[in-house]
Amino acid sequence: MKDWLDEIHWNADGLVPAIAQDHETGRVLMMAWMNREALALTASENRAIYWSRSRGKLWRKGEESGHVQKLHELRLDCDADVVILMVEQVGGIACHTGRESCFYRVFENGAWKTVDPVLKDPDAIYEHAGHHHE
């Protein structure tokens, strides 16, 4: 039987874009990258685990903030080069800025306007972690 991971069209860096959506509202929470190991672990542990390109290592979403993403469903697009994670966002905050979604700016009149409130101060979220970005 063909390995389900072999069906994915990984990019030149061995990564696939992963979009996290709220499983109840459908709101897009964030986009990150996954390598083969991250996607396999996400499926086996039923929680979002990404690949941090900046840190060059696995990033277990919520490991510093507590804002874990519990996996409800995993979907693959028609070209097999993007995955969607339907998740329960623990704490209601996906973004390191303390907002529900990383997509909190809307293009209006030629400029990006911030439209979503900060739900929790990022310093309070990461005070025990030693840095500001998960």
From Swiss-Prot:
Keywords attached to this entry: Amino-acid biosynthesis, Cytoplasm, Histidine biosynthesis, Hydrolase, Magnesium, Metal-binding, Zinc
Entry binding sites for Zn(2+): C78, C95, C102
Enzyme class: hydrolase
Gene Ontology molecular-function annotations: magnesium ion binding; phosphoribosyl-AMP cyclohydrolase activity; zinc ion binding
Primary localization: cytoplasm
EC number: 3.5.4.19
Subcellular location as annotated: Cytoplasm
Family annotation (InterPro entries): PRA-CH (IPR026660), PRib_AMP_CycHydrolase_dom (IPR002496), PRib_AMP_CycHydrolase_sf (IPR038019)
SUPFAM superfamilies named in the record: HisI-like
Cofactor note: Binds 1 Mg(2+) ion per subunit.
Pfam families membership: PRA-CH
Catalytic activity reported: 1-(5-phospho-beta-D-ribosyl)-5'-AMP + H2O = 1-(5-phospho-beta-D-ribosyl)-5-[(5-phospho-beta-D-ribosylamino)methylideneamino]imidazole-4-carboxamide
Biochemical pathway: Amino-acid biosynthesis; L-histidine biosynthesis; L-histidine from 5-phospho-alpha-D-ribose 1-diphosphate: step 3/9
Biological processes, Gene Ontology terms: L-histidine biosynthetic process
GO cellular component, one term: cytoplasm
Subunit note: Homodimer.
Family according to the record: Belongs to the PRA-CH family.
Family annotation (NCBIfam families): PRK00051.1
Protein name, as recorded: Phosphoribosyl-AMP cyclohydrolase
Native source species: Pseudomonas aeruginosa (strain ATCC 15692 / DSM 22644 / CIP 104116 / JCM 14847 / LMG 12228 / 1C / PRS 101 / PAO1)
Gene name of the record: hisI
